[in-house]
């Protein structure tokens, strides 16, 4: 919230939070000056449907889609609006993502055919379609490993840490996610 401008809207789509998470939500959503909207909807095995539903809840001109386990670099947040203003023809930005996994072994790396750089980042830059114009022609496709379609022009942000999302998890969560994705 400290990097959010007063006119910015935050829309949280919750598909299965526990009471502890709800207590955190509760601290923020009741203060209308925060401009936070909380919407609940079951995942039902399709990430694109979930993200398209989320898009329908957003009222701004642009959407910055951040997964619950991602944190944007403060430079990225501070410069999004000037980036968009300076490039009026771009409708979609690919954001590089820094993935780190606690407990990752050589066996995991080989099994999943991952690349690890000298900083321990997994598959960097792992660019994700995360900043995009809020319009009906831009929609998410595919139930898992979803992709946006419909943008007339896109651009990649620089593959530098200051333009990244941080995405950290433990190996147990990664293994659980891999099983879920394989089942969809």
Positions of PLM-derived features:
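Solvent-exposed polar/charged
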Residues: 2, 56-57
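Acidic donor-binding segment of Leloir-type glycosyltransferases
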Residues: 2-40
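Conserved residues at the C-terminal ends of beta-strands
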Residues: 13, 66, 96
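Short, acidic/glycine-rich phosphate-metal binding loop used to engage nucleotide
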Residues: 40-47
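Catalytic-site signature of metal-activated, phosphate-bearing donor transferases
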Residues: 48-55, 73-184
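Short aromatic/hydrophobic "clamp" motif used to bind/position activated sugar donors
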Residues: 63
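The conserved acidic donor/metal-binding loop of glycosyltransferases
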Residues: 67-71
